[in-house]
Curated annotation (Swiss-Prot):
It comes from Bubalus bubalis (Domestic water buffalo). Its primary physiological function is unclear. Has cytoprotective activity against internal or environmental stresses. May play a role in neuronal development and synaptic plasticity. May be required for neuronal myelin sheath maintenance. May play a role in iron uptake and iron homeostasis. Soluble oligomers are toxic to cultured neuroblastoma cells and induce apoptosis (in vitro). Association with GPC1 (via its heparan sulfate chains) targets PRNP to lipid rafts. Also provides Cu(2+) or Zn(2+) for the ascorbate-mediated GPC1 deaminase degradation of its heparan sulfate side chains. This is Major prion protein. Cu(2+) 2 binds at H80, G81, G82. A lipid is attached at A241 (GPI-anchor amidated alanine). GO terms for cellular component: Golgi apparatus; plasma membrane; side of membrane.
Amino acid sequence: MVKRHIGSWILVLFVVMWSDVGLCKKRPKPGGGWNTGGSRYPGQGSPGGNRYPSQGGGGWGQPHGGGWGQPHGGGWGQPHGGGWGQPHGGGWGQPHGGGGWGQGGTHSQWNKPSKPKTNMKHMAGAAAAGAVVGGLGGYMLGSAMSRPLIHFGNDYEDRYYRENMHRYPNQVYYRPVDQYSNQNNFVHDCVNITVKEHTVTTTTKGENFTETDIKMMERVVEQMCITQYQRESQAYYQRGASVILFSSPPVILLISLLIFLIVG
């Protein structure tokens, strides 16, 4: 009789446990995903232009209340009258007339960074995929990916991309997904840091990038950052589901009961 009651209680606990797990799986995921509302990325069809400005202020691509990519009356991607993707007259990615990436000086050239950095491939060899990269403020280096096949709308750019795609990154830098409110923010940050690091390390070796290279590199890195987000987000929710499963009261009670039966 006692064994029959124990078996009944175990059956009830299993039903409660799996009901709790089912409810956990049906809970909506937080944050806005890709094309699920909130801020969205701009269209892909515009030639040239830096689609990932690093300045704060207005909405996406609208710092200080300017039009799309036109803060303070600049041209397309030309805030304060700078050149292509040159806010405040600096080089590409040089806000306020800065020198190299992240440089505050006014005399350094974009293609002459003052502090050489380790090449991305060397970092990849030194650190396992997903490990924190030293000197990058908590960014991790993703695993290598195949560069996506992208069509740019004309034969010249399509051919140029096929011939030069080996010069563009095949890994991305990123922070953990739980540090971002949605996919757009993750991808924006991922693109900026990856293009920046790849550009600096490549120009240090004496190879420069044209405007066409930068445009294509952003498109390539964007697709890889989206893939990286999807991978990391899936892993994050799987870890969360495991924690919820093994920390739920029915599971704890069931484990305690099994231990009691085994020991007793």
